[in-house]
């Protein structure tokens, strides 16, 4: 009887450790920093095309993650994608004239937003909660690039043929 209780205790402990490890790995994979919220401020930007950008996509400066996409909506007036970005509070010295562009990690990787710092000449305001970044560059969609390449090559083939027939 005593041996059975000891055996059940160790099996239960092992099971709890396994469940804890799975929860830990799940949070790491989901890129969740824990249950405590990091202090951040939110800025918005409007793009012509966001491609496959998703909520929780990283905001990076030089490859370093400084924030995440918190929401993606459609602007009611212009019908363009409006992206809300939560920037970690420790990065509060970003000039308002900075620019955003949507990039892709690798050829077919996840999309992220790259922030290029603007200049700070003393009179330039810094981003704060509710600011809007005006200078944006939309995502380059792979299908569009392939279409342009194919269309461009057909056009040049057609021009070459017409030039050779004129001679």
Swiss-Prot record:
GO biological process: intermembrane phospholipid transfer
Segments in the Periplasmic topological domain: 28-167
GO molecular-function term, one example from the UniProt record: phospholipid transfer activity
GO CC annotations on file: plasma membrane
Disulfide-bond pairs as recorded: none
PANTHER family: INTERMEMBRANE PHOSPHOLIPID TRANSPORT SYSTEM BINDING PROTEIN MLAD, INTERMEMBRANE PHOSPHOLIPID TRANSPORT SYSTEM BINDING PROTEIN MLAD-RELATED
Task of the protein: Part of the ABC transporter complex MlaFEDB, which is involved in a phospholipid transport pathway that maintains lipid asymmetry in the outer membrane by retrograde trafficking of phospholipids from the outer membrane to the inner membrane. MlaD functions in substrate binding with strong affinity for phospholipids and modulates ATP hydrolytic activity of the complex.
Quaternary structure and interacting proteins, as annotated: The complex is composed of two ATP-binding proteins (MlaF), two transmembrane proteins (MlaE), two cytoplasmic solute-binding proteins (MlaB) and six periplasmic solute-binding proteins (MlaD).
Protein name stated in the entry: Intermembrane phospholipid transport system binding protein MlaD
Annotated organism of origin: Haemophilus influenzae (strain ATCC 51907 / DSM 11121 / KW20 / Rd)
């Amino acid at each position: 009887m005593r041996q059975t209780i000891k055996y059940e205790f160790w099996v239960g402990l092992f099971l709890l450790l396994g469940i804890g490890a799975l929860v830990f790995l799940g949070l790491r994979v989901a890129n969740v920093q824990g249950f405590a919220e990091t202090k951040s401020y939110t800025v918005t930007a409007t793009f012509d095309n966001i491609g496959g950008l998703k909520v929780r996509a990283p905001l990076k400066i030089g490859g370093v993650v400084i924030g995440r996409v918190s929401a993606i909506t459609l602007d009611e007036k212009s019908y363009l994608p409006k992206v809300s970005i939560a920037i970690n509070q420790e990065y509060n010295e970003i000039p308002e004239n900075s620019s955003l562009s949507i990039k892709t990690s690798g050829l077919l990787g996840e999309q992220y937003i790259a922030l290029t710092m603007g200049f700070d000449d003393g009179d330039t305001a810094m981003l704060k909660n509710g600011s809007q970044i005006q200078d944006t560059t939309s995502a380059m969609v792979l299908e569009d690039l392939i279409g342009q390449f194919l269309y461009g090559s057909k056009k040049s083939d057609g021009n070459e043929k017409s030039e050779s027939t004129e001679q």
